[in-house]
Amino acid sequence: MEKQRLKAQLSSLRVPLFSVPWPGQCSNKAEVIEARMMKWADEHNLLVTDEYRNRVIRTRYGLLAARCYPNAGEVLLQAIADYLVWFFLADDLFVDRVEVATDETIRNLTAMVDVLDLNVAGSPPVFGELAWLDVCQRLRRLLQAEAFERFAQGMRLWATTAALQILNHLRPTPVGIREYQTIRRHTSGLNPCTSLADAANKGSVQACEFYDADVQTLVRQTNNIVCWANDIQSLRIEIHQPGQFRNMVTIYAQQGQSLQDAVETTATRVNKEIAGFCELADAVTARPISDELHGLIDGLEYWIRGYLDWVVHDTMRYADQFIESDADDRRFSAPDLSLLKKNCSSVTESTSSLV
């Protein structure tokens, strides 16, 4: 009933555009990175059917990496692009575009945590686990130990707060906005992404600067801007998902607003976060800070602008013409046993990489 009421309002929905006061950038290696990313996804059997392959091609995850990390070295940028394609596929197939909870949900998510904790894959590995191990091993080699742990902690929180998201969707009514914001902050997967922003620019920030209260506020504002803007931009397709479909917009609508008013309320909050980010970033960079911290703040700006530009110029992930085919992944959620065996036998823990 909740979904049907929301779907009835989609045809007249107006989606706002967002702007930020700094220019976008993009790595000149974007197309090379995209092509290698597709090859890597093929080698790790992540593209379960031709239909799924075509979806990934038109989504352009490599372009997202190139826009959000324009100054990254080629090897690091490739690892990030491969991570992004893996993450979006895993998030869709394990959490978002399948039933709210399945027999495999806990096994899939705990396997992702075990790769981070143990640096090995299970036997047999779950779908995508060996690809995830490859990404993690490459990032371990490329990052300082503490910097990798920031990334790893973000991913652990993604996997564990997915359970809170599942509980929210098992309820007859959604949680409140405050609770949703907590869940969204971590299930988005953005914290692992922003944890790489310094290394992709001027090198890893020391812990004393990274965990400074103002710096963490900037990280959180970046997360809020991207996630809440995405709640608007992905609204049409998420309402058609079989499992996870509640977001900030739908919660405001559940509280009595029309869907259009809920979009506008969310957009106002995004713009307020952008203004707050700009003010605080100016204040922090006016202080005597390290080059690495300057690079991190630049990297947060790249992520905000890069994501917004990716949605407008590159990706068809949220395109209306693909909603019916892309919103429901239940037919892909349990790849047949022969494919899973192929995955396990053809890719080993010592998967080759660019490093």
From Swiss-Prot:
InterPro entries: Isoprenoid_synthase_dom_sf (IPR008949), Terpene_cyclase-like_2 (IPR034686). Substrate binds at R184. GO terms for molecular function: metal ion binding; terpene synthase activity. The record marks F88 as: Plays a critical role in the stabilization of intermediate cation. Terpene synthase that catalyzes the conversion of (2E,6E)-farnesyl diphosphate (FPP) into sesquiterpenes which are important for fungi-environment interactions. Produces a mixture consisting of 8 sesquiterpenes including corvol ethers A and B, as well as traces of epizonarene, gamma-cadinene, delta-cadinene, alpha-cadinene, alpha-cadinol, and an unidentified sesquiterpene. The major product is corvol ether A. GO terms for biological process: isoprenoid biosynthetic process. Mg(2+) 2 binds at D96. The keyword RNA-binding does not apply. Binds 3 Mg(2+) ions per subunit. Mg(2+) 1 binds at D91, D96. It catalyses: (2E,6E)-farnesyl diphosphate + H2O = (+)-corvol ether B + diphosphate; (2E,6E)-farnesyl diphosphate + H2O = (+)-corvol ether A + diphosphate. Mg(2+) 3 binds at N230, S234, E238. The Asp-Asp-Xaa-Xaa-Xaa-Asp (DDXXXD) motif is important for the catalytic activity, presumably through binding to Mg(2+). It comes from Metarhizium majus (strain ARSEF 297). Keywords: Lyase, Magnesium, Metal-binding. The record marks D92 as: Plays a critical role for substrate recognition. The keyword Repressor does not apply. Its cofactor is Mg(2+). This is Sesquiterpene synthase MAJ_08936. It comes from the Eukaryota. Its EC number is 4.2.3.163, 4.2.3.171. A motif (DDXXXD motif) lies at residues 91-96.
